[in-house]
């Protein structure tokens, strides 16, 4: 599993990696993007090493970094089994509690991964 994140989701990505290893014995790596465009990592990194790629972002997943990674994968010769894009819900309120419910958290991300991957 390769987990890609940036900004505010960087710490969460590292936590997800630890939970996947400790609870499910699924190893992986984390890439923290320094910039979003152009991508600050090479897709060749994925070649023959990872079956699954998980992108985590605090913005909505539509038109986000996960979509950009997917587009780059489709244009390349690199193949992976599954890309899981995790992002915020598209509707934000004005209250802090609303923001907390909309931005990905550890439990939410692990639940999505469990639903999507057959290895967990």
Give a label for each model feature.
Residues 1-120:
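Thiamine diphosphate
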């Amino acid at each position: 599993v390769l987990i890609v994140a940036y900004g505010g989701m960087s710490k969460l990505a590292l936590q997800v990696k630890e939970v996947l290893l400790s609870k499910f014995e699924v190893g992986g790596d984390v890439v923290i993007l320094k910039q979003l465009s152009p991508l600050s990592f090479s897709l060749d990194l994925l070649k023959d090493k990872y079956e699954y790629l998980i992108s985590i972002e605090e913005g909505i997943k539509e038109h986000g970094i996960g979509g950009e990674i997917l587009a780059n994968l489709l244009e390349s010769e690199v193949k992976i089994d599954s890309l899981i894009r995790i992002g915020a819900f598209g509707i934000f309120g004005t209250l802090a509690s609303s923001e907390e419910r909309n931005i990905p958290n550890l439990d939410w991300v692990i639940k999505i991964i469990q639903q999507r991957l057959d290895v967990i």
